[in-house]
């Protein structure tokens, strides 16, 4: 699905709202909606190969789409132990921030870092939007929430102000996200599922 497909749906669904003639503003709102879905659901899990040397302990993921560093694996697919306790003695690495980590005992070799990826920045109507079709309604509700958030004097047929319409669309968005979670779209990021990705089955 392309940005233009969503633009067409937006202009149809919100025909009674004074939308900007220029698509740029709407594309920015579409991107915010896609980003929110990526934040709520694990729509893109990627890996980056890290070359380790003994004289360097601090490493940073270089890929531009890193949203959140998740875990670290050796070349056999074994998950390294993360320190989640202050002053812990037994640990392989500690997370510094969303894209950096420190190794306890760095050795020559390769490690594989798994991370949650951000969506591509949408700039053009021809750009592809990588979300399941089942999430389109949720995306449109988020767009409706954002559109009505910017409307200060709009009054709908039933008398609601723009702010009330905004709240209504956001509640619909949350409800649809809960439905998607119940349908199995929110896959937990546990060690077993991540190790399968590392070994190349996904």
Region roles according to the model:
Residues 1-9, 28, 32-35, 90-202:
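Internal mixed-charge
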Residues 32-49:
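Generic amphipathic, hydrophobic interface segment in small proteins and small subunits
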Residues 47-61:
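Solvent-exposed, conformationally flexible loop/turn segments
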Residues 62-79:
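Solvent-exposed beta-hairpin/edge-strand motifs
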Residues 79-88:
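Short amphipathic beta-strand/extended segments with alternating polar/hydrophobic composition
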């Amino acid at each position: 699905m392309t940005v233009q497909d969503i633009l067409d749906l937006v202009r149809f669904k919100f025909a009674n709202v004074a939308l900007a003639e220029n698509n740029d503003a709407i594309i920015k709102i579409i991107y915010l909606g896609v980003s929110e879905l990526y934040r709520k659901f694990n729509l893109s899990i990627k890996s980056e190969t890290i070359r380790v040397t003994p004289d360097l302990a601090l490493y940073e993921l270089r890929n531009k789409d890193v949203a959140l560093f998740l875990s670290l694996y050796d070349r056999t697919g074994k998950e390294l132990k993360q320190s989640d306790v202050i002053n812990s003695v037994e640990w392989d690495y500690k997370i510094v921030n969303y894209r950096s980590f420190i190794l306890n005992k760095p050795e020559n070799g390769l490690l594989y870092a798994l991370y949650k990826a951000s969506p591509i920045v949408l700039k053009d109507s021809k750009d592809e939007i990588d979300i399941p079709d089942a999430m389109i309604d949720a995306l449109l509700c988020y767009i409706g929430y954002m559109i009505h958030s910017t409307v200060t004097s709009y009054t709908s047929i039933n008398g609601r102000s723009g702010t009330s319409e905004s709240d209504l669309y956001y509640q619909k968005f949350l409800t649809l996200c809960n439905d998607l979670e119940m349908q199995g779209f929110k896959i937990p990021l546990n060690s077993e599922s991540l190790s399968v990705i590392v070994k190349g089955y996904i």
